[in-house]
Amino acid sequence: MLFITSNRHKYEEAAEFLGNYNIDIKWKNMKYEEIQGDTNKEISMDSCRKLMYKIKDDFFIDDTGLYIDDLNGFPGPYASYVNKTLGNKNIIRLASGSRAHFETVISLFYSGKIYQFSGILNGTISDHESGSMNFGYDPIFIPDGYDKSLAELSISEKNRISHRSKALEIMVEFLKKQ
């Protein structure tokens, strides 16, 4: 099965997680145009529909957003763009201590149909960056029940709790029934 993403970190997390279920995925490093939708679900579905005409094999894609309560859900599905333009330091300045959550929506093209699976991770925006696993907002996001950022967790630790692993777990359960 192909995982279509231009983000190596997403692929590494998914490959490690799915490997625990003996599911081998191949990375297709491919950029594709995304709509500027209001939800990760909408963006993921639209992208999957476009890609299913280009790629005939089974594949999945992932769209993830960060929703900060004190900013009325901003940046939401625009998380990647905002991270590139504002960066973590400015998010800290705007939202340190705010409740937030990540949402990942996976769209799976399987046997000619599209299926969607989502996962959420709740937490808080930190007052500083920390950790060496520097991927997106991980250095400033402290998951509920932890006193350290996602960037301070190993991939296997992160995969036990993350929004992406929760969505992947639901996808695995779906695939087991097929």
UniProtKB/Swiss-Prot annotation:
Cofactor, free-text remark: Binds 1 Mg(2+) ion per subunit.
Protein name as it appears in the record: dITP/XTP pyrophosphatase
One GO cellular component, as annotated: cytoplasm
Enzymatic reactions: XTP + H2O = XMP + diphosphate + H(+); dITP + H2O = dIMP + diphosphate + H(+); ITP + H2O = IMP + diphosphate + H(+)
Single GO BP term: nucleotide metabolic process
InterPro entries for the chain: dITP/XTP_pyrophosphatase, ITPase-like_fam, RdgB/HAM1
Keywords: Hydrolase, Magnesium, Metal-binding, Nucleotide metabolism, Nucleotide-binding
Function: Pyrophosphatase that catalyzes the hydrolysis of nucleoside triphosphates to their monophosphate derivatives, with a high preference for the non-canonical purine nucleotides XTP (xanthosine triphosphate), dITP (deoxyinosine triphosphate) and ITP. Seems to function as a house-cleaning enzyme that removes non-canonical purine nucleotides from the nucleotide pool, thus preventing their incorporation into DNA/RNA and avoiding chromosomal lesions.
Protein's organism: Picrophilus torridus (strain ATCC 700027 / DSM 9790 / JCM 10055 / NBRC 100828 / KAW 2/3)
Binding-site residues for substrate, renumbered to this chain: 5-10, 64, 135-138, 158, 163-164
Entry's Gene Ontology molecular function annotations: dITP diphosphatase activity; ITP diphosphatase activity; metal ion binding; nucleotide binding; ribonucleoside triphosphate phosphatase activity; XTP diphosphatase activity
Residues the entry annotates as binding Mg(2+): 34, 63
